[in-house]
Structures are given as C-alpha cells and as structure tokens.
Design a protein with these regions (language model features):
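Cationic, histidine-enriched alpha-helical/coil surfaces that engage anionic ligands
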Residues: 1-171
Length: 171
C-alpha cells in the first residue's frame, strides 16, 4: 500500500477550516502526482496506489464536509466514482494473478504423463485469462475516460479552490 504523504504544520490551536484546507491540499497533490501513469495500463502497482490516494482524498473531504459544504460533496461523488472504477480494476488484477498461479500449477511437468484433461484445463485457463485481460483493457479505458471527463469538467481546479478558500465553501 502506498504511504500517505505527510501533512506538516498542523496544530490543534488552528481553526478547523485552515487545518482542513492544509490536509486537503496535500491529498490533492498526492493524487495528482500519479498523473503520469493514468494512461499506462501496465502500471498495475501505481494504479492501485492511486486508488488508495483517492480513498484518502475522499475521506478528507468527508471528514471535513462541514468546511467544504456542497462543493465538497460534488468532489466526493467524483472521487468515489474514480475510486470504485480503480477498485474493479484492482479486483481484475488480483484475479489475473490467481489465474496465472493456477495455470502455472496446472501445467503438466515434462515426463509427468500429460492427459487430455490436462490439455483442456490449460486451454480453459488460457481462455479465461484472455477474457479477463480484455475486460481489464476495457475497464482501464473506462477509467481513463472517466478521469479525463472529470478533469475537463474542472475537478482539479475545483479541488484546489476548496483547499485555498478562506471561507466556508458554498453551493
């Protein structure tokens, strides 16, 4: 799991809004540090780390919902959608690892007396693997489209605005 970026200079005697904005700013920077891997479907570990960073961003928005108000709620919906898509992608990655593991254990060893049943198991696993890889490509493409849609709609700009606002966010 990716480590959370540290949030420095948070003090208990500071106003809640100031603390919330400081934490939010760090969480936004953490999420957007993953931009270089957004279009790289092979970046499996980094994509999972992005999902965890999105989760931290969402929890920050939820924890300080009284500070960020309706503008924060809109961002929670976007972040949650991205997080869920990446969760589905991670589930597929785990499934693909499992398929490869089973296939490796199911491959007959040389001189081990391969049977027709061994061939059909290997063929079935190969088809399953191919189908799941195709689903992963489709899901990654959907994630990229979703990410791009949210960015074009101003997600980053709106998040940064929330982190810099000196007043309670409005509708």
């Amino acid at each position: 799991m990716s480590r959370a970026w540290p949030v420095n200079d948070v003090k208990a005697n500071r106003p809640l809004g100031e603390t919330a904005r400081r934490i939010l700013g760090v969480r936004i920077a953490e999420v957007y540090s993953y931009r270089p891997i957004i279009h790289r479907p092979e970046a499996v570990e980094e994509t999972h780390a992005l999902r965890i960073s999105l989760k931290r961003l969402r929890y920050t928005l939820e924890l300080f919902s009284s500070v960020f108000a309706d503008a924060g709620s809109r961002q929670i919906d976007r972040v949650k959608a991205l997080q869920e898509t990446l969760g589905d992608l991670h589930d597929l990655d785990v499934r693909l690892d499992l398929i490869r593991s089973v296939a490796d254990r199911s491959t007959p060893k040389p001189g081990g007396g391969e049977t027709a049943s061994d061939d059909s198991v290997a063929a079935g696993l190969a088809r399953y693997d191919e189908r799941e890889r195709s689903r992963r490509q489709d899901l990654h493409r959907r994630f990229v489209e979703q990410w791009n849609e949210f960015q074009q709609a101003g997600m980053r700009r709106e998040l940064v605005s929330l982190s810099q606002s000196t007043e309670r966010a409005s509708a």
